[in-house]
Amino acid sequence: MSKIEPHAARIRAFRADQNGTAAIEFAIIAPVLFFTLLSLVELGVLGMMTSALDNAVVEVSRRIRTGGADAATSASSFEDQICDRMGGAITGCRDRLTISVQKFSAFSSAGAAASAPPAGQFDKGGANDIVLVKADYRWPLMTPFVATAYNRDGPLEVTIAARAAFKNEPFQ
């Protein structure tokens, strides 16, 4: 018997032992799996926030459209109403929300202005005026993968935009 045979027998026994292989495979796959799950959850929350902002803008804009927004309605109270309808549990909503309410003479000019970010104007117009309500909400992201999907190189946040264009009713 040579000196190599006992070592070769131990090496063969070591290679034949399959204990712990699943743990090693899981350790390799786990970070990718958890990162993917976190990204999916974040995309779901982002979709929910987009829907919440759209619905809040439509609901609050209805008060302008029907003449229910009195002269005391200001940009800050309008922001408060949007934040309340988005869900009161969102902290810092007012700091992350930017709105703009503008009146136009034609829908074509309102459509051209819809792509620009809100600049803070607040002119709800009068009866039969065409009004464009713009709201942008800066949503913080948790995963850089989602930020990359939105082509963001800077801070981990994405801007959720909601627009509502309408003609005011002939209110008094």
Question: Predicted segments — roles?
Answer:
Residues 2-3, 59-172:
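Short, conserved structural patches
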Residues 1-84:
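Alpha-helical assembly-interface signal, strongest on the long, hydrophobic N-terminal helix that forms
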